[in-house]
Regions:
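Short hydrophobic/aromatic-rich motifs at helix boundaries and adjacent loops
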Residues: 43-46, 87-91, 153-154, 238-242
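Short, mixed-charge, low-aromatic patches
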Residues: 28-34, 67-76, 135-141, 154-161, ...
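Conserved ATP-binding subdomain of kinase catalytic cores across diverse folds
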Residues: 51-172
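N-terminal short leaders/motifs
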Residues: 18-28, 78-85, 215-217
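Conserved kinase catalytic-core segment
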Residues: 104-122, 176-242
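Catalytic-core segments of enzymes that bind and process phosphorylated/nucleotide-bearing substrates
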Residues: 160, 164-179, 183, 223-269
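Regulatory N- and C-terminal appendages and interdomain linkers associated
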Residues: 1-53, 186, 227-230, 269
Length: 269
């Protein structure tokens, strides 16, 4: 996505679909903006990165994981006054969007995460709604629409595999993909379909060098009362491009190991 990393202009690439913009479009095709933001004119993101510490004191950070070094901000869309564009505002946990800005430690994480998610879509893996978006100064961020929030901000039931396995968050790297498969078999309302979708996500993560698909990166959620299904894929990131020194190929064990994975390990699992 190097062609996206440049000042905004009227004839660049769409930040949602990566295809060429038409004359008069700004960062998004109207149809693409409608898909991710619900409006043909994309909302303004009226911040720059150095404001975030003051604007979001509740940002969750981790010192031990790659994804944790990214600030994660909860956003929602504020309707503009007459003839004014809509804009994003930082809100509490009820926000319908999550924003991940750039980080000094690992440059271009937003672009890399969006590209990894985009590649997953190309191979027909269902993913959460996502896109790149620009700060006021043109810097790119990653944005995703929460699937566990209704339009009015109320929460849909959603449990990640740490919760289903009754494990604390600090143990999210302690487990196996076979264990997740058993949890899906136990709790999913459509276990056969969800198991296929789950293993496709694991295989894709291995192929793309993603060693961060831990227990909290797989979840079941309920869109209708009493029925739980596997969520679309989220938080997919090719970590090997960011941390090439990491010898582990997977976040959890597969056939008892995290590295030197072979085709037979998937067959045995």
């Amino acid at each position: 996505v190097s062609y996206l990393i440049k000042p905004r202009n009227n004839m660049g690439k769409c930040l949602y679909c990566y295809k060429k913009l038409r004359e008069g479009d700004r960062d998004f095709h109207p149809a693409c903006s409608q898909k991710i933001f619900g409006t043909k004119v994309p909302p303004i993101l009226p911040y720059v990165r150095n404001q975030l510490a003051d604007l979001a004191e509740q940002v969750i950070r981790s010192q031990t994981t790659l994804t944790g070094v990214q600030a994660k901000l909860s956003l929602d869309i504020h309707k503009g006054e007459r003839n004014e564009p809509e804009r994003f505002t930082i809100v509490g946990l009820w926000g319908r969007y999550i924003l991940k800005p750039q980080t000094d430690l690992y440059p271009y994480l937003p672009e890399l995460e969006d590209l990894t998610m985009h590649l997953a879509e190309i191979v027909r893996i269902k993913v959460v709604p996502h896109s790149l978006i620009r700060f006021q100064d043109g810097e790119l961020c990653y944005i995703t629409r929460r699937i566990d929030r209704r339009e009015n901000g109320t929460k849909l039931p959603m449990e990640d595999m740490c919760q289903l396995a009754e494990r604390l968050t600090e143990y999210k790297y302690k487990g196996s993909y076979e264990q997740i498969a058993k949890l899906i078999q136990k709790y999913s309302s459509t276990p056969k379909l969800d198991l296929i979708n789950f293993w496709e996500q694991v295989i894709f993560s291995w192929i793309t060098g993603n060693a961060d698909m831990h227990l909290k990166n797989f979840s079941l959620y309920s869109q209708s009362k009493g029925n739980y299904v596997l969520t679309p894929a989220y938080d997919m990131l090719s970590t090997v491009l960011v941390m090439p020194e990491d010898t582990e190929e997977l976040a959890l064990t597969l056939n008892g190991k995290k590295s030197k994975i072979k085709k037979k390990d998937f067959i045995i699992a």
